[in-house]
Each structure stands twice: as structure tokens, then as C-alpha cells.
Amino acid sequence: MIPVILSGGSGSRLWPLSRKQFPKQFLALTGEHTLFQQTLQRLVFEGMQEPIVVCNKDHRFIVNEQLAALNLETQAILMEPFGRNTAPAVALTAMKLVNEGNDGLMLVLPADHVIEDQKALQRALALATVTAERGEMVLFGVPANKPETGYGYIKSTADALLPEGVSRVSQFVEKPDEKRAKEFVEAGGYYWNSGMFLFRASRFLEELKKHDPDIYDTCLLTLERSVQDGDALEIDASTFACCPDNSIDYAVMEKTQRACVVPLSAGWSDVGCWSSLWEVNAKDAHGNVTKGDVVIQDSRNCMIHGNGKLVSVIGLDNIVVVETKDAMMIAHKDKVQGVKQMVATLNEQGRTETQNHLEVYRPWGSYDSVDMGGRFQVKRISVKPGACLSLQMHHHRAEHWIVVSGTAQVTCDENVFLLTENQSTYIPIASVHRLRNPGKIPLEIIEVQSGSYLGEDDIERFEDIYGRSNALEAGVKTQTIAR
């Protein structure tokens, strides 16, 4: 069995923690490990091959770092230049597998879900395997035991030709209103759509070609034009842009005669909004979930998330409060589905808080914006041992570097020299420069930028060991500067 982990989502409903450049799957929201890492861990058992990860190309190094932290490897990473929904992502993966002679069962699952009962998951997988080996296309359905309006529903019907415990899909239902959701629960035979699938690679491609040939043909051409970049396959952007944006459900599962449901009663949650995150976390005696420096008084059923500041709440009921260094979100727990629309509104206003946190992770380390004004910005930069920033130049700003700890190797035009703790240097405007950590411990520096323009797109890169381009880093103009 080949796990295919879909990790391309933006997780906008969990803003302000989840942001475009560091979405929810890479956050530790329900324990020590991130949702992506938890997904990886639950797939390590006999019969499972190393996973294939499909992610946005901007997240490649986050994926590699979180894999390395668990001492795990993938058999492939597919880097999408942008999202085109789940059907193209799975099609490209299936085509790659078939081309390599690996026509195995593909277990397709999102990177950002929670499954609490590992043994129940494995029992469901065993039943699904028997079914998929017969040529069926399995969807894992979570028995609908309460009227949820945030999930799509699947109506099932008995089929004597299927293994015991497996039923045929008779209808897909979009996210219902509360009245219809109650009717579904009372009627029985309805499941929440988990977004998890099991089918043979060639079977998926056969059904995709039959029911959505545009996606099939475009993905075939896209794969031919894609290039291998080290451990990852870089999906060709120009061809992929022509691919229809469609989900597995719409493209195949709603049209095929082979769709069936295997029940998944394993403590599943898609952690799709703040209320569902509240549900899966441990609560105090009054039903409150807290994280960070939080003090609660006379409050019940709240989700309070602090990130640096003391957060104190009094007399609240069913309220979500999320504090970060640069944004705060407060909502009634029944209204958190509106967070996605709030993010869209902020994007329309050109707000940068939806894109990055003040602390930004890069393959070489991270940087944190400490202070900023009209013509200056102060950043704390951390460079991992042996890592280096790109060789670059800025047209509108100068930089002052002060070493706080570790050793820095500095390139400034033709000069290369070392700086140690408490030493500093000046990088003039238009100087070609680079920062490297040649030591065994992290390098910490304070950078003071000054100039007429401090936008992220004021960067010209000449060399980069991580293969990044100016376009990758520039992306969105923000107040923080990519390196």
C-alpha cells in the first residue's frame, strides 16, 4: 500500500495561526507533533511503503525538515506550483507510479486530519484493502452521529456483492443546513466524507479518463514536462495552469459505478475550524481549552490560544480567542466558519497578516521581525549550522549586522571575513553579500535595515544552494524581507 499525503491546503479557517506560507498541517495543534507529522507516524506499520507527499513548492523545505525530525523518508515529493484541487494531484501521482511499474493500492489522505484510534484505522484499512483489490474505489466514511453542517455527506446503500461491512455509495450531498443534517442523522445510513480514499493507481486513472478526460490529458502532458529536482518532482507550471480545478469526488467518485464506503470509526476530525479544534483537545472542568499564557475567570466552553502575551478572559461562553504577535481573532464558537471569509476580506485589503507570521521559516533557518518604522526594520536572524543565505543584492536598502551568538562568515562584494559574538559589519546599498554559518551551533544575529524601500521584492539573487528563484521569494509584497 502506498500512502499519498495531500499537503497543499492553506488552512485559512484556522487563521491567524494558519497562514499561506505556514499552513495548519505544519503546526502542532493537538500535541507535540504537527498534523503532518502525526499523519506520517500513523502510516508506519507493516505493509506500508514509504509515502508520497504532494505539496506546494513553497513548502518543500518545511516538509523535508518535518520528515527529518521524525527520521522518516519519502519515496517522492511532488511540488505543485499552485493548487488545482485533489483530482489533478492524485492523477499526477498515479501516473508517476504506473510509469515506474508500481501499480499498487494508493491510500490517499489529507495531511491535516486527526485520527485518535490507530487500531480502528488499521481495521478499516484491512477491510478497504480486500475491497480495493477487487477493483472497487473505496471512500472512508465517518458514521454521521450528530448534525454537522461543516462536512459533506455520503448516502450509502447495501450491496450483496461487496464484502461484509462495505456499502455502495448512492449519493454525495454537499454540506447541508442544520435541518437537513438532522434528517440525515435520524434516517441513518449517512456518513461524513473523510476525504480519504483507497484504490489501485491504474483503476483511478481508468475512471478519471472515462469521467474527466480533460484532467487526465492535461496531467499526462504536465507529467511529461515536469522535471526532477533532487528528491522532488517540480510540476510544470505552464501546463498545469491549464488543468481543470476539481476534486476527486466531483471528477470521479460521484460518477463511477465502483464507489463504495468503508466505515471509519476512529476518532476522526478534519480539524477544519476552531470549533473542531476545540473538540479534539483536552478541556478543563469548565470545558475550556487553553494554550499559552492564559488566565480564565468565570468562563465556559472557550478556546483561548495565547502566543507570547498574557491573555486573560472573564465571563465568556463559547468564545474563541486567538492571539499571535501581529494579529488577534475573536469569534463566537458557532460562527467560526466565517473565518475563511474574514481571510478573504483581509486579502482584498492587501493585509499581509494572512501570508506570513512575523517569524518566517526558511531552509537555512528563520527570521523574526522585531521592530519597524518608515525607513527602518529590525530583525532577529537565526542560521542553522552549515547553512547559508543566498548571494544577493538590494537596490534600496543598507544593512547592519550584529552577531549575538555563534560565528558568521560574511561575503560583502570581494571581501570574505569572519565575525564572532559582539562584532558587527555594514552592508552598503547595492553590495553583493551573503551570510553563512560555518560553525557547529546556531548563528544568531540582529539585522538593522535602513533605506527608502524595504519591500520583500527588493532582492536580486545570484546564487542559492536551495534552488530558489526571485519569483519564489518575492511572491507577495510584505513588510518583511525574504532571504
UniProtKB/Swiss-Prot annotation:
Catalytic activity: D-mannose 6-phosphate = D-fructose 6-phosphate; alpha-D-mannose 1-phosphate + GTP + H(+) = GDP-alpha-D-mannose + diphosphate
Assigned EC number: 5.3.1.8, 2.7.7.13
Coiled coil: none
Residue pairs linked by disulfide bridges in the UniProt entry: none
Pathway: Nucleotide-sugar biosynthesis; GDP-alpha-D-mannose biosynthesis; GDP-alpha-D-mannose from alpha-D-mannose 1-phosphate (GTP route): step 1/1; Nucleotide-sugar biosynthesis; GDP-alpha-D-mannose biosynthesis; alpha-D-mannose 1-phosphate from D-fructose 6-phosphate: step 1/2
Any Pfam family: MannoseP_isomer
InterPro entries from the UniProt entry: GMPP_N, Man1P_GuaTrfase/Man6P_Isoase, Man6P_isomerase-2_C, ManC/GMP-like_b-helix, Mannose-6P_isomerase_type2, NTP_transferase_dom, Nucleotide-diphossugar_trans, RmlC-like_jellyroll
Summary of subunit composition and partner proteins: Monomer.
Protein name: Alginate biosynthesis protein AlgA
Lineage, broadest ranks: Bacteria, Pseudomonadati, Pseudomonadota, Gammaproteobacteria, Pseudomonadales
